[in-house]
Design a protein with these regions (language model features):
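Conserved recognition-core residues within compact binding domains
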Residues: 1-80, 84-101
Length: 101
């Protein structure tokens, strides 16, 4: 059993969530209750993202930026793009709906 570091809530509206593999992600304070889950890192097309499993080892993969995008009311039938290209920057001003075209 490996314990992850507790999230860091700064006074500037940003919460840092510590992930597996020594990585971290940042979210806005409005989403900081998501820090209560254990998040890990996965790589897709060379970009790192935060995810967690629901329902055990063979359960569903919940991707952090898509969970935040849903809370923002973004259309999840689209891709969710990280404006700055950093898949671990999950602040709301860095997420937008985009097409794959």
């Amino acid at each position: 059993l490996k314990l992850l570091r507790a999230p860091h809530r700064s006074g500037d509206g940003i919460t840092t969530i510590f992930l597996s593999q020594g990585e971290f992600t940042q979210v806005d304070s409005v989403d900081d209750e998501l820090a209560e889950f254990n998040w890990s890192v996965y790589v897709n097309r060379g970009c790192r993202y935060a995810f967690r499993k629901v329902g055990g080892r063979k359960g569903k993969k919940v991707i952090l930026h898509r969970e935040i995008a849903a809370r923002m009311g973004l259309d999840l039938t689209n891709e969710i793009d990280h404006v700055d290209g950093n898949g671990l920057n999950n602040r709301r001003n860095n997420l937008r709906a985009a097409t794959t075209a």
